[in-house]
């Protein structure tokens, strides 16, 4: 018996249409998504062409566009910074096994699907002698869809102690060691594992 393909093609086209329209975003959310996508395109341009990119260091890694989850506004949170009264200097490991000293500065909190989570904010010193602040984390996607060592979020300190920060996991990124073995990067501690699949931000490169 001969089966017509027309109904199947029609259903396939409908499913593609529904897939592209699966979420109803507000105009503000759509503007945010466009901003994230623009940022990602600019980062690809940097990674491909800039001399400081890991893809141009010793020419050992071939560039290809970075992989991401689709931007998802539900992975954007607000939190103040809760500074630790005693800011301990602790030792962490780099991916090549070397010890590094870092200050456990404070933490941020967020709620997802009615569950509370916490991530530490660390203070370090760059090679140029500049202070920097960062969040390093692993989650349920680590070693699967995302880089096994973990991912990072930059953190810009505001002098106002009551300032409300935006914690945007759509901006979570891989450290350079995810692309090239020439680099060593900080390994997130077990304390900074969140029992949640953070399906936002950058995916595994390899």
Region locations from a protein language model:
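C-terminal motif of bacterial Sec signal peptides marking the signal peptidase cleavage site
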Residues: 17-20
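Bacterial signal peptide processing site
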Residues: 22-24
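Mid-length scaffold segments of soluble, non-membrane domains
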Residues: 85-149
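Acidic, glycine-rich flexible loop segments
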Residues: 136-173
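Extended, aromatic/histidine-rich regions of cofactor-dependent oxidoreductases associated
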Residues: 172-206
């Amino acid at each position: 018996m001969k089966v017509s393909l027309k109904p199947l093609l029609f259903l396939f086209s409908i499913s593609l249409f529904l897939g592209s329209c699966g979420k109803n975003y507000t105009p503000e959310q759509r503007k945010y998504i466009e901003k994230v996508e623009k940022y990602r395109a600019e980062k690809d341009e940097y990674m491909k062409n800039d001399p400081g990119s890991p893809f141009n260091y010793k020419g050992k890694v071939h560039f290809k566009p970075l992989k991401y989850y689709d931007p998802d506004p539900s992975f954007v949170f607000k939190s103040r910074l809760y500074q630790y009264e005693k800011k301990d200097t602790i030792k962490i490991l780099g991916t090549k096994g070397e010890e590094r000293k870092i200050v456990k500065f404070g933490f941020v909190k967020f709620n997802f699907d009615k569950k509370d989570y916490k991530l530490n904010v660390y203070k370090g010193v760059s090679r140029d002698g500049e202070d920097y602040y960062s969040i390093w984390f692993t989650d349920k996607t680590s070693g699967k869809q995302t880089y096994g060592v973990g991912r990072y979020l930059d953190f810009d300190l505001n002098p106002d102690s009551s300032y409300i920060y935006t914690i945007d996991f759509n901006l979570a990124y891989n450290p350079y060691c995810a692309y090239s073995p020439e680099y060593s990067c900080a390994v997130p501690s077990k304390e900074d594992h969140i029992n949640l699949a953070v399906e936002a931000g950058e995916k595994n490169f390899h």
